[in-house]
Amino acid sequence: MAKEELIEFGGVVSEALPDNRYRVLLENGVEIWAYASGKMQKHRIRILAGDRVTLEMSPYDLTKGRINFRHKS
């Protein structure tokens, strides 16, 4: 079975929550829950409220996502 294509979005972190979880406001105005990807956790990349991020979402659940890049401010 082939791996499903992920949908990529941009957004701004509105709130940092415990356990590497974040509330992100997407460019289209929808607010979702997101978590930091494994490489970001491994390299201890800090994500704070107000950071611009790129995240991936599954086409099956558009309420959760995985942050895979933090843009430089």
Curated annotation (Swiss-Prot):
Query: Which GO terms label this protein's molecular function in UniProt?
Result: ribosome binding; rRNA binding; translation initiation factor activity
Alphabetical list of Pfam families matching this protein: eIF-1a
* Bridged cysteine pairs (disulfide): none
* Subcellular location, principal: cytoplasm
Keyword Cytoplasm in annotation:
yes
Q: What CDD domains has UniProt attached to this entry?
A: S1_IF1
Could you identify this protein by its name? Translation initiation factor IF-1 1
